[in-house]
Amino acid sequence: MALLDLCGAARGQRPEWAALDAGSGGRSDPGHYSFSAQAPELALPRGMQPTAFLRSFGGDQERNVQIEMAHGTTTLAFKFQHGVIVAVDSRATAGSYISSLRMNKVIEINPYLLGTMSGCAADCQYWERLLAKECRLYYLRNGERISVSAASKLLSNMMLQYRGMGLSMGSMICGWDKKGPGLYYVDDNGTRLSGQMFSTGSGNTYAYGVMDSGYRQDLSPEEAYDLGRRAIAYATHRDNYSGGVVNMYHMKEDGWVKVESSDVSDLLYKYGEAAL
């Protein structure tokens, strides 16, 4: 009601969008998604399934129509003795077209949770912002922060409800809770994995090669920063769909901090000079 007062609505009046459906016990707005409602789901448009609709365009060679999402990125995250390091590139592509060189592929869910973007940018941003809302509601209802495990499970449950409907998302959820640092991988199929190290995107094979050669649990913060920095920089050198700058975050016990934004061209030049 405080929001209605702020908007200037008279007391005692409730607009249609603010009323609950008494018969179902859930919200009357079919486009609202909330775990607090009895039937938390988004309304789908009438007609054929989204995957069948897209397939009908992709198979017609005479019209030369191709609606296959072509995208690329390189994101990584790994745990070590001082928390979790998250490093991503910043190049956004639409097929062979580079649409942006300054896209931040880390979504700041709350001061103790971070999510990465890999796949379709719209899907990643929408669902992780929805996750941020649910994490905030959990805090308001329970008086404590949601755990990293529970947050990743919420995102996985969202993906399971829309499995096979054309979503494209591969995200890493990292944070710090009562159990310490946590790192999970969640994709559009609802897959949820816990681990020490993950990398997603078209350049992940190159990033894994660098991380595997230098990763240790007892890394110092500066060594961990350099490892994440090198992994993204060398991945952008080999992968045409990755580039821009290296955005790096460090998840600590008292919350995340943004470490740096370094241009990959400058980094590769510096590494090349050091190798001579």
Swiss-Prot record:
Known partners and oligomeric status: The 26S proteasome consists of a 20S proteasome core and two 19S regulatory subunits. The 20S proteasome core is composed of 28 subunits that are arranged in four stacked rings, resulting in a barrel-shaped structure. The two end rings are each formed by seven alpha subunits, and the two central rings are each formed by seven beta subunits. The catalytic chamber with the active sites is on the inside of the barrel. Component of the immunoproteasome, where it displaces the equivalent housekeeping subunit PSMB5.
GO molecular function term, any single one: threonine-type endopeptidase activity
One GO cellular component term: proteasome core complex, beta-subunit complex
Keyword Nucleus: yes
Origin species: Mus musculus (Mouse)
Subcellular locations according to the entry: Cytoplasm; Nucleus
CDD domains for this protein: proteasome_beta_type_5
Family affiliation: Belongs to the peptidase T1B family.
Pfam families: Proteasome
Gene induction: Up-regulated by interferon gamma (at protein level). Up-regulated by IRF1. Down-regulated in spleen by deoxynivalenol (DON), a mycotoxin that alters immune functions. Down-regulated by the selective inhibitor PR-957. Up-regulated by heat shock treatment. Down-regulated by EGR1 in neuronal cells.
Enzyme superclass (EC): hydrolase
InterPro entries: Ntn_hydrolases_N (IPR029055), Pept_T1A_subB (IPR000243), Proteasome_bsu_CS (IPR016050), Proteasome_sua/b (IPR001353), Proteasome_suB-type (IPR023333)
Catalytic activity, EC: 3.4.25.1
BP GO annotations: antigen processing and presentation; fat cell differentiation; proteasome-mediated ubiquitin-dependent protein catabolic process
Tissue expression summary: Detected in liver (at protein level). Expressed in spleen, thymus, lung, liver, heart and, at a very low level, in kidney. Not expressed in brain nor testis.
Gene: Psmb8
Name recorded for this polypeptide: Proteasome subunit beta type-8
Effect on the protein upon substituting residue 275 to S: In allele LMP7q
Modification comment: Autocleaved. The resulting N-terminal Thr residue of the mature subunit is responsible for the nucleophile proteolytic activity.
Site (Cleavage): 72-73
Catalytic reaction equation(s): Cleavage of peptide bonds with very broad specificity
Catalytic residues (UniProt): 73
Propeptide: 1-72
